[in-house]
């Protein structure tokens, strides 16, 4: 019994050194150039700057159990599961017309910057409108080009 406990203690992973933990769970924010979408577009640099119904739809879509980290927050950039650190991190969002285009980082094997757009549903009987994910708006790569494409009506085939 004691030998088993000693073997288990020996095989237990040592805590990550602080610099490794930081690189894996709190990597630096990417430097993103401004994206000129023309007049009337607004920008949010934090989830806190989004309307409540947009945040609610993001939470529903991405699973409330594993929320998206806010800009600059903890973010698991690798495919190694290491605690409750989210594998998505908000970068910024643009509102133009009926859309909020969300820029975020995805960690893991297929890591990198992504977009997803939410479109405003028409007002309901009580006058309130809601936002829903717009199908075909998940793009990777140059987020500004993707945002302009989404606003021009381009949709991806894989969504």
Language-model segments: residues:
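Hydrophobic alpha-helical targeting segments used for export or membrane insertion
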Residues: 2-12
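Flexible low-complexity loop/turn motifs enriched in small/helix-breaking residues
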Residues: 12-98, 134-159
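Solvent-exposed loop/turn segments at secondary-structure junctions
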Residues: 106-110, 139
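Metallo-beta-lactamase
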Residues: 130
């Amino acid at each position: 019994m004691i030998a088993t406990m000693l073997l288990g203690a020996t095989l237990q992973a040592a805590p990550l050194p602080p610099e490794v933990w930081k690189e894996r769970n709190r990597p630096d924010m990417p430097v993103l150039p401004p994206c000129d979408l023309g007049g009337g577009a607004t920008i949010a640099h934090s989830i806190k700057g989004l309307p409540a119904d947009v945040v609610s739809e993001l939470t529903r879509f991405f699973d409330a159990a594993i929320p998206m980290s806010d800009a600059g927050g903890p973010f698991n950039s690798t495919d190694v599961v290491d605690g409750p650190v989210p594998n998505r991190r908000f970068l910024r969002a643009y509102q133009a017309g009926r859309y909020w285009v969300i820029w975020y980082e995805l960690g893991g094997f297929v890591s990198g910057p992504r977009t997803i757009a939410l479109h405003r549903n028409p007002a309901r009987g009580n006058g309130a409108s809601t936002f829903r994910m717009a199908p075909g708006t998940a793009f990777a790569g140059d987020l500004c080009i993707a945002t302009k494409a989404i606003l021009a009506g381009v949709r991806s085939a894989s969504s």
